[in-house]
Amino acid sequence: MSPKARVLIYVLRRDLRLADNPVFHEVSRLSQQSQHPFTHFLPVFTFPANQVEVSGFVSDSAKKSPYPEARAPVSGFWRCGKLRAKFLAESVWDLKKDLERIGSDLQVRVGTVHDAVQSILQGYKENNQVDIAGVWMTNEEGVEEKREEKDVRKLCKEFDAEFKLWQDEKYFVDEYVHFHKIAAQYTRLTETP
C-alpha cells in the first residue's frame, strides 16, 4: 500500500501573483528538498461573496444565491464596481494560466473563504487517502480579513491541520527609518529609500 498523499493548501486572497509571491517561492524551495512535508500543493482562490456580487455564478437562473448581495451594510452601495471586478477576474485568470504553465493549477471557488476551506478539508477527510499537510494564508489588514483568518485557524484546529499565517510583504513600516521621508503620493513612494 502506498503512503497517503499529503496536501498543502494555500488560500489566496489579494496576493494574486506568481513571480514575486513569497509563499510560492517557499513551496518551490520545499518541493526540491528530498524530504518535503507535502506531496501535493493546492492553491485556492475564493471570489468573496461579501465583496463581489456572486449571484451570477449560480448556474440555474431560477435559484437564488445562498449569499446576500455584496452591498455595504450602512450605505447600501455595491462594494465592488465593474472595474474592480474586471481587475480581480483578470488577475485570477492570469495566475491560473501562470500556474498551469509550470504544471500546477488554481482551484477557483465562490462564496466565503470559510466555506471553501471547510468544503476542501471535509472532502479530504472523507476521502481517507489524503492527509492535510497544512493550510497557509497571507496576513491581511482589515476587520473582515482578520475574521477570515480566525475562521480558517479554527477550522484547521477542528480538522487537526497545521495553520500558518504568512506576513504580508507588500510593505514593512520598519524599513523606513525616517517617517518624514515617506512620500505622500504613491508614485513617489516607490522611489522612497
Per-range role (PLM):
Residues M1-S104:
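N-terminal beta-strand-loop-alpha-helix module at the start
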